[in-house]
């Protein structure tokens, strides 16, 4: 669930490439032919995530800061949300029309390991399934650009086969807590030491794992 952003997602006909950068170099000398995506039309207005109280220490939850920044951009008709260098721990990010989420080099958007933060709520009622870390529904002119990283924190979501990891890695997983099944051949991030479950069984919890990014 980790993805380096060189040229990533956009919406409708607007798969995007650029905000103050030339991504053409990433299309040179490829083993297969790829067309560069069509640029989204983003207003010439920008805000920095830190303007809304975000702290890039990898520990502070910045969900509210993302919400405030996107709300500000939406009021202005859109623009660029600059995510500077740092590790920006967050829950769900919901993009709106005409917004470019731009990750500068060495910027990491890190999904919170608290899985309870990955549900949307309406009128105080929580959805039955987790939502993608970054999403948008029925929106237009959305782009995600830059040379940063979006890290979905997959270690707290996906099961691990004993045969696929080293002894050191296996020990590290089990130090998180978790549950072994299949005679110790499979580890699930269920009953972790520091984070609660979101289902009654390891298998049911695994079925709730969702996409990193979804634009519909």
Annotate each language-model stretch with its function.
Residues 2-82, 87-100, 104-216:
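Extracellular "leader-to-stem" segments immediately downstream of a signal peptide or signal-anchor
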């Amino acid at each position: 669930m980790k993805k380096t952003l060189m040229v990533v997602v956009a919406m409708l006909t607007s798969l995007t490439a650029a905000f103050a950068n030339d991504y053409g170099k990433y299309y040179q000398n490829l083993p297969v032919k790829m067309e560069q995506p069509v640029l989204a039309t983003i207003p010439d207005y920008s805000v920095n995530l830190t303007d809304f109280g975000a702290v890039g220490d990898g520990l502070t939850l910045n969900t509210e800061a993302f919400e405030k920044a996107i709300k500000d951009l939406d009021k202005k008709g859109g623009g660029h949300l600059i995510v500077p260098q740092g590790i920006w721990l967050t829950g769900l990010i919901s993009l709106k029309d005409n917004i470019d989420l731009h990750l500068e080099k060495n910027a990491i958007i890190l999904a919170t390991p608290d899985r309870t933060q990955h549900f949307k709520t309406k009128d105080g009622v929580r959805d039955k399934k987790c939502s993608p870390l970054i999403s948008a529904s029925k929106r237009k002119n959305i782009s995600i650009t830059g040379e940063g990283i979006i890290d979905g924190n997959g270690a707290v979501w996906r099961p691990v086969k004993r045969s696929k990891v080293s002894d050191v890695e296996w020990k590290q997983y089990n130090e998180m807590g978790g549950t072994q099944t299949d005679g110790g051949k499979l580890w699930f991030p269920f009953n972790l030491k520091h984070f609660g479950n979101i289902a009654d069984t390891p298998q049911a919890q695994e079925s709730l794992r969702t996409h990193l990014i979804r634009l519909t």
